[in-house]
């Protein structure tokens, strides 16, 4: 918690976040940003920031969920591959997947994805979404520009110029909301699955 809401309340587990110990709250939340930081050292070292006690089996399981195992298995040194400063020797999509794996190792109760699959292809993103769907006890907040990233969510919130515009499921919004319809038709009908058609 970096700052408090100016209106209303933010609740976790039905309880105002201001009632939680800050460190306990931060331990319960995992966040993956669009641009994450990887440290100099091995991939293993980087992943263990999520869980210092993780075994190799744990690391590989998280990498499978994040679809990082596919490119890791092609690296001669696997988990012991040295990363350049800031992860300069892996692609943007590979970096995002490693950061997702690292966050999954934390076993958070609340998982926040802030455009964190923007650099991966839609097939890989679909696999990651499928893996996340198996985390039934985890609350997932996904901030995204791709319709495909959020269309299976229990609830979708549309912000327009920083204000709450509409709330509903994919089917509800597609039936009644013009902004959602515009984004959908721009991305899906126009073949723009990467979300570049409409930005709000």
Residue map of PLM features:
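Conserved catalytic loops of ABC-family nucleotide-binding domains
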Residues: 133-144, 150
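ABC nucleotide-binding domain signature
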Residues: 23, 29-34, 141
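A short, proline-enriched helix->beta-strand linker immediately N-terminal to the Walker B motif
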Residues: 105-109
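C-terminal portion of ABC ATPase nucleotide-binding domains
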Residues: 74-76, 130, 151-200
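Conserved D-loop/post-Walker B switch-helix segment of ABC ATPase nucleotide-binding domains
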Residues: 121-131
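Catalytic Walker B motif of ABC-type/P-loop ATPase nucleotide-binding domains
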Residues: 111-114
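ABC ATPase nucleotide-binding domain helical subdomain, centered on the C-loop/LSGGQ "ABC signature"
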Residues: 9-11, 19, 26, 44-85, ...
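ABC-fold ATPase nucleotide-binding domain signature/coupling loops
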Residues: 5, 11-16, 69-98, 116, ...
């Amino acid at each position: 918690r970096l700052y408090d809401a100016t209106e209303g309340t933010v609740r976790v587990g039905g309880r105002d976040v201001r009632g939680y110990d800050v460190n306990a709250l931060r331990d319960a939340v995992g966040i993956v940003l669009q641009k994450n930081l990887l440290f100099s050292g091995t991939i293993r070292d980087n992943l263990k920031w999520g869980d210092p006690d993780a075994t190799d089996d744990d690391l590989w399981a998280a990498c499978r969920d994040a679809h990082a195992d596919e490119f890791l298995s092609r690296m001669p040194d696997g988990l012991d591959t040295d990363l350049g400063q800031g992860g300069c020797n892996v692609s943007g999509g590979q970096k995002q997947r490693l950061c997702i794996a690292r966050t999954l190792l934390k076993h958070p109760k609340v998982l926040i994805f802030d455009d964190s699959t923007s650099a991966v292809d839609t097939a890989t993103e679909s696999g990651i979404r499928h893996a996340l769907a198996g985390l039934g006890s985890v609350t997932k907040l996904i901030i995204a520009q791709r319709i495909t990233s959020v269309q299976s969510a229990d609830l979708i919130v549309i912000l327009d110029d920083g204000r709450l515009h509409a709330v509903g499921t994919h089917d509800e919004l597609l039936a009644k909301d013009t902004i959602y319809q515009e984004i959908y038709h721009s991305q899906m009908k126009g073949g723009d699955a990467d979300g570049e058609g409409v930005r709000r």
